[in-house]
Structure formats: structure tokens, C-alpha cells
């Protein structure tokens, strides 16, 4: 996976291709990228555990890039849906730590962003690793908000909507290294 400070590729931000063959090819690419993301998260978790950390890994059921004007509440950022079988362990980890540090590892494939978010609490040596993915073109409003606010949020909830935790990040560019270019491109199109 590419780290946040690696240059972003020049993949277009429009919707994925639409013919049957193109969609099938994209599906295979997305499946491989998702599998690699999960493998990367598990390897990161193993490394942290070898260093003595308690690690919770979560493969999200869905990840939505939500701008402030989207959704039923005031939350904005990446909203991860945590499957019920991960919820108790996630909730317990959140209760144990403050998670003042984070890192993000991302890659893009065929208009989709694949990422692993590391939430780290050095005081308790607890780490939460979240694997998620979303369509890049659906993040335009969030990219603009994150750049304007100079911060980013990660939220976790269950499928039923139970809030499991929210985390503020000062470095939105780890999530969207191409934010300035995308916002300027959007302004040029207006």
C-alpha cells in the first residue's frame, strides 16, 4: 500500500466504467486490491502484536465518505460500518484508550480508494486497525471540507447505527494527498 506522503496517481475522479466487460475487469481489480488491503492490515497487526501491543482488526462492512451536508447527523469524515461480530471488541478497545496517534496507508485502483487506518494509543499499547474502501468520486464534498477545516474524522458505527467511536485527525492529507488538486479542479469546473 502507498503511504499518505507518496504521490497520488492521476486516475480520473469520475464514475467507474460502465460496460459489462469493463465492470467485470474492475470487479476483479477491486477484489484483488481489497484482498491485498486485508492482508496488509493483518501483517500490520501481527507486527504490532510482536511489539507487545493489543490489536483489534476490523474489516468494515461499508465505508462512506460523508461531508457535513450528508447523513442524518452532524458527523463528517469517513464513516465505517463495523460488523456485529467485531463491535464488542472494538467498543472495548475504544473504552481502554485515547488514541492520540494515527497513521493511514492507502492505495487506489480503478477509481476506488483502499485503506488501512491505524488508531494508536501508546499509553495502553492498544491499536485499532480498520480496513475500508470507497469510491473516490463520492468523496468530493468530504475532500473539500477536510481541506477547508484542516482536519479529518474517522467514525465507527454498527449496521443498526450504534455509535462506537469517533477520532479526530489533524492531518487530512494522509487521507486525501491530492486534496488541493481535486478542490482546485472542482473549482475550475464550476
List PLM regions with ranges.
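Subunit-assembly interface segments of extracellular/virion macromolecular structures
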Residues: 27, 36-37, 47, 51
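A generic structural signal for short
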Residues: 32-33
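Terminal disorder- and signal-encoded targeting elements
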Residues: 1-29, 184-190
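Short secondary-structure junctions
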Residues: 53-59
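Glycine-rich, aromatic-bearing surface loops/beta-hairpins
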Residues: 127-190
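Long, continuous compositionally biased terminal/linker segments
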Residues: 59-122
Amino acid at each position: 500500500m502507498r503511504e499518505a506522503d507518496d504521490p497520488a496517481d492521476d486516475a480520473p475522479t469520475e464514475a467507474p466504467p460502465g460496460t459489462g466487460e469493463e465492470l467485470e475487469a474492475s470487479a476483479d481489480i477491486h477484489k484483488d486490491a481489497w484482498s491485498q488491503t486485508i492482508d496488509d492490515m493483518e501483517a500490520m497487526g501481527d507486527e504490532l502484536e510482536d511489539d507487545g501491543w493489543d490489536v483489534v482488526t476490523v474489516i468494515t462492512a461499508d465505508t462512506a465518505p460523508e461531508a457535513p451536508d450528508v447523513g442524518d447527523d452532524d458527523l463528517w469524515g469517513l464513516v465505517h460500518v463495523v460488523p456485529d461480530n467485531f463491535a464488542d471488541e472494538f467498543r472495548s478497545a475504544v473504552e481502554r484508550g485515547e488514541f492520540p496517534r494515527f497513521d493511514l496507508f492507502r492505495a487506489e485502483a480503478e477509481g476506488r480508494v483502499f485503506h488501512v487506518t491505524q488508531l494508536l494509543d501508546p499509553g495502553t499499547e492498544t491499536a485499532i486497525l480498520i480496513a475500508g474502501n470507497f469510491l473516490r468520486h463520492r468523496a468530493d464534498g468530504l475532500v473539500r471540507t477536510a481541506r477547508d477545516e484542516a482536519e479529518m474524522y474517522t467514525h465507527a458505527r454498527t449496521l443498526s447505527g450504534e455509535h462506537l467511536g469517533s477520532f479526530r485527525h489533524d492531518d487530512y492529507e494522509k487521507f486525501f494527498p491530492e486534496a488541493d488538486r481535486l478542490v482546485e479542479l472542482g473549482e475550475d469546473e464550476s
